[in-house]
Each structure stands twice: as structure tokens, then as C-alpha cells.
Amino acid sequence: FVISGGLLLLPAPPGTPGSDRGRWERSEDDETRCRQALARLAGVLSALALAPPRVLSFPDRENETLALAAAELLGVPCAPFAPSAGPGLVVAYDLARVLPELVATLHHHAPGQLLWAHAARWTREQPVVGDLLSFLYRRNVSPWERHLILDPRRTDLPAGPPAEPPAELATRLMGRPLVPDEADEADEAALLGLARAAAAAPPAGRPALLQADGVRERLWIGSPVPHGPPHRDP
């Protein structure tokens, strides 16, 4: 939040192997984490009295699946993203996987247009950072790419990519149960408290979600908190 005004929905829990101050070193994303991120997304929007009229999706399986799930949760329609799309919640699984020419159109805030990027690689600079980020990673495998993990000891890995279309994947994702523990509830309470407090700040210090003009920050390598030598991936 200090660097970009974006809100982080799912910091890596303390003690997560390979994590670095809330950021995943190696992440194997799954539908349960996606479902949890969606719940926190809805909580933040409600806390800030934001009601996007629709969800805007980039092409590709990961983007469409998350966008359709978000639309179902928020009770709004889902439409393809276009530079002139106007108000709505723009959903990307990972902006690093979106065509650069589309990402470039998000450089400036637009009235009523919010940007949620589920995953963001914190070891490589990117031209735009989401107003909402689910998690930060150095290496990540999406829930629908687990067949690419090469580990003969893993009997739980699928043989290939999912055959279902994004609409069916979104329905399955939304069916994942949420079983929060005390740590989850404390994290969510802290997130919503930060969102409300920041919303009451002077305009320049408010969350990126509440900015109707100006530019979105880049995703910079590093952090304002102390840590080891900065990582930079090629």
C-alpha cells in the first residue's frame, strides 16, 4: 500500500516455507485460494461502498475463469475488456500474462474502473500494479496449470489441462468451501481496517481503488520494509 496504494488481499501466512514478509517464494495456487481471494475482494468493495456495475475480463482461461467467478459473486454481468469499456471491475489472473498493449491502457485511472490482479510477480518490474492484489510471488503455478509440475512423487497432479470451459471452472471454483481459522479472520479484519482508514485519508493518500484520475503506479521490485538483498529475475 505504501508504494502503490494497492491493497494486498492474501499475504503469505507467517511460517510459510520460502515466504518473504508476506510474499511467496514458490506458490502453487489452487481454487481454494482463489475462492478466498474473491471473498476478501467482495469484503473490501463492501467496506468502501464500491459497487462496480460489471466485471471486465481479459481473454485466456485463467482470466475468464476468475472474471466469471467474480461476476457470479458480485451479481453483475461479465463482458470482455476493451480500452473504452468504461466503469467496471477489470479482472486479471496475472497482468504479466496479459498482452502489453492491453495493460498499457490501464496506466491511467478511469472513473468507476477498478483493477484486480490476482497474482503479481514481485521480482520483476511491471508497468501497472493492480488496485487490488491477491498475492505476490516469485514463482507461481496457476490452479489450471498444475499438469506442468514435473514431480514423479506427486500422485495428485492432473495429466493435462482442464477440459472444462471457463464457465464450468468458475462454477466449480465458487463451490469451494471457505473454512477460515482465527488467523484468517484476523488478517481479514486488519485488511478491512486498513481499507477504511486509508479511505478517510486526504485524497492523495487514499487507496488506488478510490482514485478516479491520475496514473497507476508501476509494480516495483522490492519493498519499503527491511529484508534481505533484493531479488531480480531475468
Language-model regions: role of each:
Residues F1-P234:
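PRPP-associated nucleotide enzymes
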